[in-house]
């Protein structure tokens, strides 16, 4: 049915993030990772494969996937058959699944059954539930019912007291004295209800089923008595999961366990025994035999096994046949068995035709000699109630729609007598706990009141337990007839016949009609309605489960089931909802999931009592009828997987009790994803907004984007030819006053109105014939083009209820048109256009991206524009418009060739667009065709899921699913939103920016009240997505405190910054914060908004802020003093741009860079002037009066000069500069102090704190490499120079932003030599203590971003290898922090070879995984395939081999002597040991458990050798949600666009052009050299790696498109003979590698730390991975304080001060090193204590565990610890944080040391999330009133919510010393 290519596509789709949901699940106390359930897979296939029409076809396709090895069983042992059942499967990612044609029938088998009905997922799931706590539970209802019936049963209970007492006394000597509590089955409702949860055999505990799903237990956890195993009847109902001694399993687990139990080969071995007088032989097993099997199978204790076995017995899996007695013991047996209950053997000894009446008559004839007995039937959601029947069995059943009566079985005394007279019957007795309970004359125990019915079909069960002994035997019940008879005999109210292969229901089921309330017939073979007639006789039935059958209709007799409240019909063949269902007026839960329904009947409104409706995975349902709004009691609605329901009707907001919605988020278009992603409350709120009134938008935006000179404006003119043009001056507030002739040139955005005629709308739909379109007839015949579908589609208009609107009948069709507002961007600067166009993008816009068909695709910028649009509007239609086809002369003028090239270009980069079309704006060729495509795309939006088979269309399955929008022509928008937008547009003419308070006042004019805050937030977010305003709902910053009403005003603000390039911004792209007020004049931008606008520009990644340091003032000094030192020779001088001279002490921190994240307190309400009266004024430019020659000279002075290529001369020049540095710093010392009196920050007038004083604008940096870069870099190109490098391969072009953050960090952390827009060359600043020859300052580092290969390339060169290795480690540390904090994913990491000078320039790239593998094997070298030389791993990867750490720190395992274990961590164990005759602590890492973190294996790359020159490297690029960087812009074009405003740049551009030409020549030469080396390389590969290349070719044939996985592996000459399956690296998980990297980081960090209060690392070991540290004999501070508390002792005040002072001293050292180190996990368990060797009473404290520590160069944003006890509020919020977070943690330690308790333990929070919420709300531990005042004040300061108000550790040490002195003085 599916060919090879289709299976490959299906495999990719089902395994994608939007495919089948996989998660960790528990089955029989074992957790399985990344698994799914069989029926989930069938549901997904049925819902997502259009060709699959039935579930049978879906099962067959699942079997095909199973046979192909794409999916496999979790465990081994079962038949390799794919089942639509509760079976666990997983994706077989550990095998090579490329060859799908080879059936893998030997895949690992035996499925493990799902433990619960897990939520099946089609694509992205929207499971929305409203959290609410219910005060009234089933337990409360049952207790009330019991109390009401106590008096009615008082007499009956008193009559039975004597019998009960006798039973109790006789049972005192009984063998049944087990203290094990009765089994408890606990279930909970799933938060995400689906077809499976409704249609499964039971609704089970999701907490047991999945570790990822929260559940709400039915029981109260506080009522469980954990000290005793015997309970009263009421206590039994309150047993909960939290008790470790009580084993609870869900029903599905028990059912599957029973199947394994009855498996002849691996199940229980049965014994042959004789029973009865006739000596009938039966197959049975003993209790101890069963317990032994369970203990071995489940690896649990015997007590737990008894619990599980008892639960199986209560499910009627087996029955007790009792003890076989001899004749001589009859009397004793009779005495011991008095009052016992007849065993369930009756169900096998009586004929199947026996009737309940016959049994009743027999019971009545022996009523005088029989003793009534009670069987406890425990419902899983209600307390136990025992109903005692009289001897005549005359008790009436109390029935209700919501309760079930639990009855007891009264056995015949004649049968009991027979069993006592040697008949051989096996008579069981009741447990003592039951008889003891029954001896109490408690009316409540013997009431006959009904019980609350369970919400699932788990049967009621009593407190019988399986006996763990060898003389009590049990027999399996396998036949349905026997189970029915057993239930009838024991009068149970629950009948479970699941998985019994039933095709006809036995007629004996009528015997259960009087008391049966729950029946489960799921997973059988019922297909005809007449087979269900017998169910209609069960007039007391309340729950019926018929799921997983083949039913298509129900018998009309079902209407008799008047008490039915729950009906499960999921996973059947229903095409319509049976009419009989609508007659069940008491129905509360209805599930029709995974059927073939095509519509929802309007009769659904008749089910007034319905509370839960599941219609999921009926993919033909296209709307929700408005009659559903009549279900006022509805609480849960599930339409998940209904692929044609694309909107949620507004009437759902009127359902008062609705608390849960389940739907497919990628299909639902209204509400939009921005609303649905926020949860249930926001969805209902938006639907309420719609319900109050809706409108359709009057127009649709059509935005024309594209690079410069691609014909954007010409295309707009061609589209609007012969139509009236409507101009819009967007920046009237800012632009200069110009004449009318200048308007068209300077208007930044020209908005033109275009009206297109739509096909006439008729009563039955929309006519889409192309003949009705307003197309020009004079155009040339269109060539074959790539476009969207033009198939005939008929969308319907919807009203607010989601139903089709009735069009008035007319004789002629209605004529319609659509109004498009074309946005033509005419920004005055290319930089402004590239960076600020994103302000105007709208999710409700149509996009045209222009591209000149005559230009090279690689420079088209299509990636940038498509990614930029996708970021703001991921589902908007995008057309690539190839212009200038009239001038295309290649390929004989056939434009099909370049259009196909565009198609391939987009496909290779995974750029998803709607279509590609070629046009000519001059001849108007295909312009009408483009209009037609726009119209058809708008019409087809409501039917965007239809497949298009037109070969000329650029459209595949992936694109058609992802590029899908709502039907904008008919979409209803809340009227209040449109009113607000109109009012804001009027207000924007007066003031373009307002505070949030002012914005709320404006909203009041649009009928937004004070109480409608959430509505205003929804409306504001919607307008922001439309591009009407700019606002960020960001609780982590102050961006939410203001709203920009005019996006063009904000764009002009940025333009003003660019205009100041030569007046206030130097050539380095640096702007002083103090100069900002000279650019943004007060009458243009109020100064109160300056910082906020900078924050917003940084959020868009247009500019970056730089943290305060003295670099800036020194840079200014250097520029001013350059003339004084002008007599220096070129060899001994460095210009201002090359080197930033710094004068710092060795102890001061390095200057740092921080993203604009520091919180600035909100300014008071601002009074803005009327912006319409303010215009831009050009700032004073000092260069305006200079001649062109002077400007050129100044520009040349600013450019870095070439220096000598000799490293020796460079080092000499650096020595000479040292004296200059000292002189320059002394000359202007006073000026520095005056200009930077507050070195740590600036204070605003209102007291707000600013942590930066400079801004860098990357777009102002030169685009091309400096011409003298080669000469600078060649400084370190000698034979004796070393090189260490690392290449990061990224997936998409957004990685450019990653480089910008890296560059900004190194700009002021290091000493830049030269930098440009895509690279930076720097050295580390030299300190006076360093020897320049051996220091890191003698090394050079080049960091570049290759825009062609999307690689971030890092190379460090130097004469001394140790210095290079140390510097390289620092660079990697900072890059790694940026990648993690900003969650930037790179697809692969490479290590460049440096075996020779030639290889250093054009290196072979080793995949890092290969080096990891080689080093893991103990090898020290690898071979370079280019030069065939051996390369030392230590030289190319010092971070992996830790060669940067001193060699005397490396320890061999033989040198270590292990002693006892002293600590255990998550993935490490700490041992006490001996090293060099000294006692040490050995922290040994255990990576065997890393498979629990990440089971992702590594696969091979297709390419062996990857060189940076290989621009044709195939990389699969994916779209990204991060901000994008614009493509490289030619500065010459910039000059043309700036026009008269930037005339002073002309001469500068000439110099740039010259540099670019020279750079291009150098690049051409390099390319030629690269091509020659590539040819040599290819020849070597063909000779030496021929076999491996053949394997790669075979892999390429099996794959359609190359892909980049997370950590790929490439073979080399060392492993060329190894097959892919034998590659040992494939067995290493990425989680393990990450852990190993953290081990290396910790070793590297600790090796450089030396302080008396830092735990000293004495060495490290690779085999095994271990760190040897000094031994701290007392242990952790946490355990020390705990022991003090337990012993009732207090911590001596002097000792307390000594401990906290030691900790503060160690942390002060970390924060003051260069660069500072943030611990990030400071807590009492990570503080180790040791006693003094000579004075045991003296204790020293030391800081340890640096696995999470990071160098603080800029703030962090990632949360690395899950326990919130010691975490600061900014970390919990996910905000950026710095060393101040350690201060907060230290405050908690201060409190902990004084109170000897863990923080927040006093509040007894049960959930970490609750604790986090309270911490964020300001909760802190209570401080004892007797605490020292200064100490208490210090605690409060340290844990202040504002990080800026927390003291530093230097200040803390000073305070602690003052406390110590005050204590001494007080004595």
From Swiss-Prot:
Give the reaction(s) catalysed: L-seryl-[protein] + ATP = O-phospho-L-seryl-[protein] + ADP + H(+); L-threonyl-[protein] + ATP = O-phospho-L-threonyl-[protein] + ADP + H(+)
Region entry Disordered: which residue ranges?
A: 96-115, 121-225, 763-813, 942-961, 1163-1207, 1509-1546
The species this protein belongs to is Dictyostelium discoideum (Social amoeba)
Q: Which InterPro entries match?
A: COR-A, DEP_dom, Kinase-like_dom_sf, Leu-rich_rpt, Leu-rich_rpt_typical-subtyp, LRR_dom_sf, LRR_R13L4/SHOC2-like, P-loop_NTPase
Q: Give the record's GO CC terms.
A: cytoplasm; cytosol
Q: What is this protein called?
A: Probable serine/threonine-protein kinase roco8
Residues where ATP binds: 1462-1470, 1483
Gene symbol? roco8
Q: Domain (Roc): give its ranges.
A: 693-941
């Amino acid at each position: 049915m599916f060919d090879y290519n289709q299976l490959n596509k299906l495999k990719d789709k089902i395994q994608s993030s939007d495919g089948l949901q996989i998660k960790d699940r528990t089955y029989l106390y074992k957790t399985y990772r990344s698994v799914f359930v069989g029926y989930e897979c069938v549901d997904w296939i049925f819902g997502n494969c259009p060709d699959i029409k039935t579930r049978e076809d879906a099962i067959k396709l699942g079997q095909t996937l199973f046979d192909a090895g794409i999916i496999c069983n979790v465990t081994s042992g079962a038949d390799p058959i794919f089942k639509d059942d509760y079976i666990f499967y997983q994706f077989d990612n550990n095998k090579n699944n490329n060859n799908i044609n080879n059936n893998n029938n030997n895949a690992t088998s035996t499925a493990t059954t799902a433990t619960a009905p897990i939520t099946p997922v089609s694509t992205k799931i929207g499971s929305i539930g409203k959290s609410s706590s219910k005060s009234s539970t089933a337990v409360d209802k049952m207790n009330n019912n019991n109390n009401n019936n106590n008096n009615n049963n008082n007499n009956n209970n008193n009559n039975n007291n004597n019998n009960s007492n006798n039973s109790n006394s006789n049972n005192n000597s009984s063998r049944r004295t087990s203290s094990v509590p009765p089994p408890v089955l606990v279930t909970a409702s799933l938060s995400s209800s689906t077809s499976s949860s409704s249609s499964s055999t039971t609704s089970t505990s999701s907490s047991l089923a999945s570790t990822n799903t929260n559940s709400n237990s039915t029981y109260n956890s506080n009522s469980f008595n954990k000290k005793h195993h015997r309970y009263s009847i009421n206590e039994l109902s309150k047993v909960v999961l939290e008790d470790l001694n009580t084993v609870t399993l869900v029903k599905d687990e028990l059912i599957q366990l029973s199947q394994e139990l009855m498996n002849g080969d691996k199940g229980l071995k049965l014994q042959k025994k004789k029973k009865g007088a006739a000596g009938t032989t039966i197959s049975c097993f003993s209790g101890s035999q069963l317990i032994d099997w369970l203990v071995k199978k489940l690896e649990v204790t015997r007590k737990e096994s008894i619990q599980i076995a008892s639960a199986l017995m209560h499910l009627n899996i087996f029955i007790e046949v009792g003890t076989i007695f001899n004749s001589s013991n009859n009397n004793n047996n009779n005495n011991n068995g008095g009052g016992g209950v007849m065993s369930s053997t009756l169900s096998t000894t009586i004929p199947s035709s026996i009737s309940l009446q016959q049994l009743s008559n027999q019971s009545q004839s022996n009523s005088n000699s029989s003793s009534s007995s009670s069987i406890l039937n425990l419902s899983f959601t209600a307390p136990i109630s025992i109903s005692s029947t009289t001897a005549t069995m005359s008790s009436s059943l109390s029935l209700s729609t919501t309760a079930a009566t639990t009855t007891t079985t009264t056995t015949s005394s004649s049968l009991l007598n027979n069993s006592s007279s040697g008949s051989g019957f096996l008579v069981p007795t009741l447990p003592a706990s039951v008889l003891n309970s029954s001896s109490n004359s408690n009316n409540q125990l013997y009431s006959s009141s009904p019980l609350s019915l369970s919400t699932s079909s788990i049967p009621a069960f009593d407190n019988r337990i399986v006996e763990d002994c060898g003389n009590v035997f049990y027999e399996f019940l396998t036949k349905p007839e026997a189970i029915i008879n057993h239930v009838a005999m024991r009068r149970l109210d629950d009948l479970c016949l699941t998985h019994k292969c039933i095709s006809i229901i036995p007629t004996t089921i009528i015997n259960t009609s009087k008391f049966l309330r729950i029946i489960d017939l799921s997973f059988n073979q019922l297909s005809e309605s007449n087979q269900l007639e017998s169910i209609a006789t069960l007039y007391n039935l309340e729950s019926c489960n018929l799921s997983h059958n083949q039913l298509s209709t129900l018998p009309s007799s079902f209407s008799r089931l008047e008490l039915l409240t729950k009906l499960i019909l999921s996973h059947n063949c229903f095409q319509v909802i049976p009419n009989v269902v609508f007659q069940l007026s008491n129905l509360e839960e209805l599930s029709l999931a995974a059927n073939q329904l095509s519509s929802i009947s309007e009769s659904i409104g008749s089910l007034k009592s319905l509370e839960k409706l599941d219609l999921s995975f009926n993919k033909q349902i296209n709307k929700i009828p408005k009659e559903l709004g009549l279900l006022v009691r509805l609480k849960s609605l599930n339409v998940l997987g209904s692929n044609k329901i694309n909107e949620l009707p507004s009437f759902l907001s009127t359902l008062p009790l609705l608390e849960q919605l389940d739907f497919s988020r990628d299909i639902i278009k209204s509400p939009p994803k921005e609303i649905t992603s926020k949860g249930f409350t926001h969805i209902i709120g938006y639907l309420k907004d719609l319900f109050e009134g809706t409108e359709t938008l009057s127009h649709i935006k059509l935005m024309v984007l594209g690079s410069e000179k691609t014909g954007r404006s010409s295309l707009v003119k061609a589209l609007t030819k012969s139509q009236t043009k409507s101009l819009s001056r967007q920046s009237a507030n800012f632009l200069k006053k110009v004449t009318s002739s200048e308007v068209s040139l300077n208007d930044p955005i020209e908005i033109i109105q275009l009206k297109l005629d739509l096909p006439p709308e008729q009563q039955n739909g929309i006519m889409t014939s192309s003949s009705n379109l307003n197309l020009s007839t004079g155009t040339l015949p269109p060539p074959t083009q790539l476009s969207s579908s033009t198939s005939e589609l008929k969308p319907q208009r919807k009203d607010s209820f989601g139903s089709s609107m009735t069009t008035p009948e007319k004789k002629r069709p209605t004529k319609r048109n659509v109004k498009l507002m074309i946005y033509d961007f005419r920004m005055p600067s290319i930089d402004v256009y590239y960076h600020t166009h994103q302000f105007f993008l709208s999710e409700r816009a149509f996009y045209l991206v222009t591209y000149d068909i005559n230009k090279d695709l690689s420079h088209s910028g299509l990636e940038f524009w498509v990614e930029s649009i996708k970021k703001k509007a991921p589902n908007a239609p995008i057309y690539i418009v190839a212009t200038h086809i009239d001038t295309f002369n290649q390929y004989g003028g056939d434009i099909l060739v370049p259009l196909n090239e565009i198609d391939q270009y987009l496909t290779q980069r995974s750029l998803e667009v709607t279509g590609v079309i070629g046009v000519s704006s001059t001849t108007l060729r295909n312009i009408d065709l483009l209009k037609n495509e726009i119209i058809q795309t708008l019409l087809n939006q409501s039917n965007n899921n239809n497949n298009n088979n037109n070969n000329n269309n650029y459209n595949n399955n992936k694109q058609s699913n992802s590029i899908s929008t709502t039907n904008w022509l008919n979409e209803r928008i809340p009227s209040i939103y449109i009113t607000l937008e109109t009012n804001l547009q009027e207000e924007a003419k007066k003031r373009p920016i307002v505070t949030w308070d002012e914005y709320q006042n404006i909203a009041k004019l649009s009928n937004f009240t004070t109480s409608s805050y959430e509505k205003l937030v929804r409306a504001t977010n919607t307008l922001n997505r439309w591009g009407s305003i700019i606002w960020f709902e960001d609780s982590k910053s102050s961006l939410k405190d203001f709203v920009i009403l005019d996006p063009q005003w904000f764009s002009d603000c940025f333009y003003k910054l660019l205009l100041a390039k030569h007046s206030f911004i130097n050539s380095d792209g640096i702007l002083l914060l103090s100069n900002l007020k000279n650019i943004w004049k007060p009458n243009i931008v109020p100064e109160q908004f300056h910082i906020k606008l900078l924050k917003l520009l940084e959020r868009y990644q247009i500019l970056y802020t730089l943290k305060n340091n003295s670099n800036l003032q020194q840079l200014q000094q250097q520029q001013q003093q350059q003339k004084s030192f002008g007599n220096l020779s070129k060899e001994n001088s460095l210009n201002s741009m090359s080197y930033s001279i710094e004068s710092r002490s060795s102890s001061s921190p390095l200057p740092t860079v921080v993203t604009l994240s520091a919180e600035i307190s909100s300014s008071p309400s601002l009074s803005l002037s009327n912006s319409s009266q303010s215009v831009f004024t050009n700032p004073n430019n000092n260069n305006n009066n200079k001649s062109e020659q002077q400007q050129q000279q100044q520009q040349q002075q600013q450019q870095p000069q070439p220096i000598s290529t000799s490293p020796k001369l460079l080092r000499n020049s650096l020595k000479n500069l040292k004296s200059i540095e000292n002189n320059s710093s002394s000359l202007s010392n006073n000026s520095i102090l005056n200009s930077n009196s507050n070195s740590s920050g600036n204070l605003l007038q209102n007291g707000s704190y600013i942590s930066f004083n400079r801004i860098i604008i990357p777009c102002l940096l030169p685009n091309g490499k400096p011409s003298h870069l080669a000469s600078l870099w060649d400084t370190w190109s000698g034979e004796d120079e070393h090189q260490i490098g690392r290449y990061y391969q990224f997936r998409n072009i957004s990685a450019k932003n990653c480089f910008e953050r890296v560059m900004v960090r190194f700009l002021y952390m290091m000493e830049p030599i030269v930098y440009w827009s895509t690279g930076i060359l720097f050295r580390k600043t030299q300190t006076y203590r360093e020897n320049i020859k051996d220091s890191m300052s003698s090394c050079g580092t080049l960091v570049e971003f290759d825009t062609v290969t999307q690689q971030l390339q890092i190379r460090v060169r130097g004469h001394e290898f140790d210095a290079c290795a140390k510097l390289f480690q620092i660079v990697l540390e900072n890059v790694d922090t940026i990648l993690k904090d900003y969650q930037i994913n790179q697809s692969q990491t490479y290590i460049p070879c440096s075996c020779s000078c030639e290889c250093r320039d054009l290196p072979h790239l080793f995949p890092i995984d290969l080096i990891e593998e080689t080093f893991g094997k103990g090898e020290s070298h690898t071979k370079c395939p280019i030069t065939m030389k051996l390369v030392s791993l230590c030289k190319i990867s010092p971070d992996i081999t830790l060669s940067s750490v001193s060699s005397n720190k490396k320890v061999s395992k033989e040198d270590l002597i292990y002693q006892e274990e002293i600590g255990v961590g998550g993935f490490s164990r700490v041992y006490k040991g001996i090293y060099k005759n000294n006692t040490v602590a050995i922290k040994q890492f255990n990576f065997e458990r890393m498979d629990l973190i990440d089971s992702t294996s590594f696969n091979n790359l297709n390419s062996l050798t990857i060189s940076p020159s290989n621009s044709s490297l195939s990389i699969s690029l994916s779209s990204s949600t991060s901000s994008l960087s614009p493509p490289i812009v030619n500065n010459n074009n910039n000059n043309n666009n700036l026009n008269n405003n930037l005339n002073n740049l002309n001469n500068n551009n000439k110099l740039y052009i010259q540099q670019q030409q020279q750079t291009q020549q150098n690049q051409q030469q390099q390319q030629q050299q690269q091509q020659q080396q590539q040819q040599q390389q290819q020849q070597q590969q063909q000779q030496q790696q021929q076999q491996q290349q053949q394997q790669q070719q075979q892999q390429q044939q099996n794959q359609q498109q190359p892909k980049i996985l997370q950590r790929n592996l490439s073979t080399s000459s060392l492993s060329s003979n190894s097959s892919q399956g034998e590659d040992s690296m494939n067995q290493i998980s990425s989680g393990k590698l990450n852990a190993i990297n953290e081990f290396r980081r910790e070793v590297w960090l600790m090796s450089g730390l030396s302080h008396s209060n830092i735990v000293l690392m004495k060495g490290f070991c690779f085999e095994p991975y271990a760190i040897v540290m000094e031994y701290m004999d007392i242990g952790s501070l946490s355990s020390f304080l705990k022991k003090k508390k337990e012993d009732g002792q207090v911590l001596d005040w002097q000792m307390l001060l000594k401990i906290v002072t030691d900790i503060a001293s160690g942390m002060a050292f970390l924060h003051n090193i260069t660069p500072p180190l943030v611990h990030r996990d400071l807590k009492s368990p990570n503080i180790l204590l040791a006693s003094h060797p000579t004075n045991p009473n003296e204790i020293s404290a030391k800081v340890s565990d640096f696995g999470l520590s990071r160098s603080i160069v800029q703030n962090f944003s990632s949360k690395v610890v899950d326990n919130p006890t010691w975490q600061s509020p900014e970390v919990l919020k996910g905000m950026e944080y710095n060393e101040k977070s350690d201060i907060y943690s230290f405050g908690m330690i201060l409190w902990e040391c004084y109170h000897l308790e863990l923080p927040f333990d006093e509040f007894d929070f049960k959930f970490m999330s609750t604790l986090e919420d309270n911490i964020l709300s300001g909760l802190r531990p209570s401080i004892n009133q007797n605490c020292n005042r200064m100490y208490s004040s210090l605690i409060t300061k340290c844990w202040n919510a504002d990080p800026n108000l927390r003291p530093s550790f230097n200040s803390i040490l000073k305070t602690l010393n003052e406390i110590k002195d005050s204590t001494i003085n007080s004595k």
